[in-house]
């Protein structure tokens, strides 16, 4: 294939001449388009977040733009997005250009994210990503600086004394990936809640059986109920500092109810924005619990985002907190059967909110038996303050469809 122009004397590399783009500039300063540096604290944060999922990063995508770096990968069959903002790096520079996408896998054995594996953590001191050339033919050069002990062979070649520490570097080169599309929700979540690590663990504790559906339900009495099989956990939600809360609070009614418990109520979930009633069921093939456990969160909590509209594709998003966010999205559906509405019965029981419902061994059903389904009978609706008797004492038939408010 002929080059678009003749090579100059001295022999520039053929890759320096590209169809439909400008040739690479000889000046290295002008040729550089972006640079990201991980060192000291930013490097430790990257290790902390990426090491647990390192086996899933071989075929990850790295997307650079003016906001920083986004890592897109698949963990346990679920899509995971890790945005690393510019303030989470030691330094970052970007010249205006379309986002640059690179596949982490270099040659089947090595990858651009191998530097963040646990086995290299003690040796790596600095990781630099440098992007050169013009879109759509940019080149990424990764340089990893690490320390190693001097050997007898190094001493014979004139290096420092044997046993001293020497800084070495290794490089990987990767060309831009041009056939890539990234899909992320562009709308704001309808409801957002902030959870601590302990509260998130209580939710994971409910998800015992892999085949049991997981249901998230937000009720009138400002509670979030999570159910799976015959287990459930109920949290109170504090909307005091939430934005755009359009539902009148019923906390005053709850304060008047006697709470027969000697234990203090656990810390409530903090509502960030939105305040709506909903019931969402995670899709059956969702690896919700397995994915969160694989991330090995330490003391950081998470933010639950509920995307309720449009009705055809509701989702639940979960974003971890410090050192930087890891985002994941789970497809959901609205229940087809009428479900419980109104107040949570657990709000008036002696069991504190945020605590799982404990059952005696004699009350436990056999593990191979499906949990009992709730039907819209009188008992169900009476427990939720729905009037079922008229003034003459005649019983009013229960509605067959869910009640919408």
UniProtKB/Swiss-Prot annotation:
Major location (coarse): host cell
Region feature (Disordered): 354-376
Classification via InterPro entries: DNA_clamp_sf (IPR046938), Herpes_UL42 (IPR003202)
UniProt keyword annotations, A-Z: DNA replication, DNA-binding, Host nucleus
Gene3D superfamilies reported for this sequence: 3.70.10.10
Pfam families on file: Herpes_UL42
Residue span of motif Bipartite nuclear localization signal: 358-373
Gene Ontology biological-process entries: DNA replication; positive regulation of DNA-directed DNA polymerase activity
SUPFAM superfamilies xref list: DNA clamp
One GO CC term, this protein: host cell nucleus
Subcellular location: Host nucleus
GO molecular function: DNA binding
DNA-binding among keywords: yes
Function: Plays an essential role in viral DNA replication by acting as the polymerase accessory subunit. Associates with the viral polymerase to increase its processivity and forms high-affinity direct interactions with DNA. Facilitates the origin-binding protein loading onto DNA thus increasing its ability to assemble into a functional complex capable of unwinding duplex DNA.
Subunit structure and binding partners: Interacts with the DNA polymerase catalytic subunit. Interacts with the origin-binding protein.
UniProt family annotation: Belongs to the herpesviridae DNA polymerase processivity factor family.
Protein name according to UniProt: DNA polymerase processivity factor
Naturally occurring in which organism (per UniProt): Equine herpesvirus 1 (strain Ab4p) (EHV-1)
């Amino acid at each position: 294939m002929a080059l678009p122009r003749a090579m100059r004397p001295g022999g520039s590399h053929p890759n320096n001449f590209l169809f439909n783009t400008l040739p690479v500039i000889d000046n290295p300063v002008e040729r550089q388009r972006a640079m990201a540096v991980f060192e000291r604290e930013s490097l430790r944060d990257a290790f902390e977040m990426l090491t647990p999922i390192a086996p899933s990063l071989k075929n990850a995508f790295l997307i650079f733009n003016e906001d920083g770096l986004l890592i897109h990968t698949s963990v346990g069959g679920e899509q995971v997005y890790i945005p690393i903002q510019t303030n989470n790096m030691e330094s970052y520079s970007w010249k205006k250009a379309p986002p640059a996408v690179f596949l982490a896998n270099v040659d089947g054995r090595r990858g651009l994210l191998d530097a963040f594996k646990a086995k290299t953590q003690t040796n790596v001191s600095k990781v630099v990503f440098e992007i050169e050339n013009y879109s759509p033919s940019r080149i990424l050069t990764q340089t990893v600086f690490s320390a190693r002990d001097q050997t007898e062979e190094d001493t014979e070649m004139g290096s420092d004394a044997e046993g001293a520490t020497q800084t070495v570097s290794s490089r990987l080169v990767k060309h831009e990936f041009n056939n890539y599309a990234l899909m992320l929700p562009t709308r704001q979540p309808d409801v957002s809640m902030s959870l601590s690590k302990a509260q998130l663990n209580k939710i994971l504790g409910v998800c015992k059986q892999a085949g049991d559906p997981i249901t998230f339900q937000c009720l009138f009495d400002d509670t979030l109920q999570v159910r799976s099989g015959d287990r459930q956990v109920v949290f109170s939600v504090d909307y005091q500092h939430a934005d755009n809360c359009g539902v009148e609070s019923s906390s005053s009614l709850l304060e008047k109810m006697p709470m027969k418990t000697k234990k203090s109520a656990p810390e409530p979930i903090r509502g960030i924005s939105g305040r709506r009633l909903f019931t969402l069921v995670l899709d059956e093939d969702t690896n919700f619990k397995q994915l969160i456990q694989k991330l090995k969160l330490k003391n950081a909590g998470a933010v639950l985002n509920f995307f309720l509209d449009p009705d055809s594709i509701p989702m639940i998003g979960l974003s971890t907190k410090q050192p930087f966010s890891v985002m994941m999205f789970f497809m959901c559906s609205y229940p087809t059967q009428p479900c419980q509405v109104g107040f949570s019965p657990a709000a008036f029981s002696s069991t504190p909110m945020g605590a799982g419902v404990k059952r005696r061994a004699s009350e436990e059903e056999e593990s191979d038996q499906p949990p009992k389904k709730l039907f819209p009978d009188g008992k169900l609706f009476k427990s939720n303050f729905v009037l079922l008797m008229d003034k003459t004492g005649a019983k009013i038939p229960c509605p067959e469809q869910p009640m919408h408010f």
